C-alpha cells in the first residue's frame, strides 16, 4: 500500500533540541506546506542511518560523523540542513574521579561511548597521547552516558555539553556539590580539530527519496525554518507549547538542557562548508572514510540566502565556551553574537 506520508526518524527519544520538528507539526507548518509527516522515535539510535539509507524511512536526524560514515558503508544518505551547530562534545567525568585534564589520566578507567564511532575516536586519541586501546576499558552505553557515570558503571564517557553534561550538573546540585564539578575533555581540542562540528546534528534524507521528491524536501525545510524562527524569537513561549505536547519533558533538567541548546540552534539551517571539509578529513584520519570520499551534503533545498561563515572559527569556539558557562550560571536564553 502506497502513502503520501513522509516518515521522519529522530536520532533519539524526544529531547529539548527536537523542538523545531515537533512545533512544525503541532503549529501546522508542515500542513501549510501540504505535507503529511510521521515523526518516529528509534529504539536503537545506531539504527537511524541504516533505516534511512535502506529506504525504510524517508528522512531523519543524525550527527555529521555518522552521516559521513553511513554513505561510506553503503547507506545512501545526504544532509540537507543543520539543526544543532557544533555542540561541545567530549569525555565527561566528575571531579574527584581520578581523572584530570591530562588525557593519560584515563589509563585504567572505564570509558563509555554511544556507538562504535565513539570508541574509534577514543582509540585514535590513545595513540595520539602515547597510550594503547588496551589501556582503558570501553563500555558501550548508548545514550546513557551520564546515567552510567552517576551509577558508577563507568568513570567517564563521551557526551555533549548541552545534554549529558547538564544531566551531570543536575545530579551534582542534588548532592550539594558545585555544578562545575562536571568536567569535559573536549574532543575537538584533544584531536586538534579546531571545531566541534563532527557532532553537528543534521537533517538527512534517503538519496532516492531526495531525488524523487525535491519539492517535498524544500517544503519540509521551509516549515522547519518557520518553526526554528519561532523558537528563537520566543523560546519560553515555544517551550510551553512543546511540553504541552510532550509532557514528559516538563521538568527542570529538560528546561536547563533547552537553555543550553538555545545558542547551538542553526538559525539559517545551512550546512557549513568549512565544517564538512574538516570532519571529512577527520573521518579519513579515523579510517572510517576512504581517501577519495566526497562529502554527502547539499544546501540546494534551502530557499533563503546563505549567511557568510565566521571568519575565525577558533575564536568563535572560545567565545561560545564563555557564553555557555554564563548560560549555566545565569540560566538565560541568549544567542552568541559573533564578530564578523
Curated annotation (Swiss-Prot):
It catalyses: N(6)-(pyridoxal phosphate)-L-lysyl-[4-amino-5-hydroxymethyl-2-methylpyrimidine phosphate synthase] + L-histidyl-[4-amino-5-hydroxymethyl-2-methylpyrimidine phosphate synthase] + 2 Fe(3+) + 4 H2O = L-lysyl-[4-amino-5-hydroxymethyl-2-methylpyrimidine phosphate synthase] + (2S)-2-amino-5-hydroxy-4-oxopentanoyl-[4-amino-5-hydroxymethyl-2-methylpyrimidine phosphate synthase] + 4-amino-2-methyl-5-(phosphooxymethyl)pyrimidine + 3-oxopropanoate + 2 Fe(2+) + 2 H(+). InterPro entries: NMT1/THI5 (IPR027939), SsuA/THI5 (IPR015168). It is an enzyme of class 2 (transferase). CDD domains: PBP2_THI5 (cd13650). Pyridoxal 5'-phosphate binds at residues 115-118. The modification N6-(pyridoxal phosphate)lysine is found at residue 62. The active site is at residue 66. GO terms for molecular function: 4-amino-5-hydroxymethyl-2-methylpyrimidine phosphate synthase activity from histidine and PLP; metal ion binding. Keywords: Iron, Metal-binding, Pyridoxal phosphate, Thiamine biosynthesis, Transferase. It holds the Pfam family NMT1. The keyword Metal-binding applies. Its EC number is 2.-.-.-. Pathway: Cofactor biosynthesis; thiamine diphosphate biosynthesis. It comes from the Eukaryota. Homodimer. Responsible for the formation of the pyrimidine heterocycle in the thiamine biosynthesis pathway. Catalyzes the formation of hydroxymethylpyrimidine phosphate (HMP-P) from histidine and pyridoxal phosphate (PLP). The protein uses PLP and the active site histidine to form HMP-P, generating an inactive enzyme. The enzyme can only undergo a single turnover, which suggests it is a suicide enzyme. Belongs to the NMT1/THI5 family. This is 4-amino-5-hydroxymethyl-2-methylpyrimidine phosphate synthase THI12. It comes from Saccharomyces cerevisiae (strain ATCC 204508 / S288c) (Baker's yeast).
